[in-house]
């Protein structure tokens, strides 16, 4: 409060009580909603840029996102579009990954199939071993913490591959089980374009070159 802000910009995850406490201080509050797809991210950027009087910078940032998404799509041969299926496995969020979440939309932009959504499951429904077996995907992505820990990463991958109930699934037999940083999965800002690049590269290989990742800005 010593800074005497003109407005508070807060994320809805802080909770209604905290948000109301800011409003009770007499300062306008803008609540950023959790984005469930890339289009919502773009819309939020434009709304925020207008709010702070920097609409042109917002437009520049959205253009950067669109240009990078278009580059990724151009590099994936059309005959490969949606030819491979994936399943996201998250030990901490076992009900994440179906229709209506950011991961599902990232898959769409990467031109890969989200096996969980293909099964008709919405995000919020549990992805257990029975679901994995029914889908029998081409790729498994195992969500790992943002902070690298080689021992824990190897343990996570080793335990999954050692599961006898999964050993005959296509992704396991073909060696297509990959660790995926959570920063590519649980993301609600402009760098979600790098998530699209990462997934497309993991599935379709070198036709999608890995551009160096940077935090995208509107200037």
PLM feature spans:
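Short gly/ser/thr-rich secondary-structure transition/capping motifs
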Residues: 68, 120-124, 160
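Alpha-helical, coiled-coil/dimerization segments enriched in small aliphatic residues
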Residues: 99-124
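Long, aromatic- and glycine/proline-rich binding clefts that accommodate carbohydrate-like moieties
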Residues: 160-178
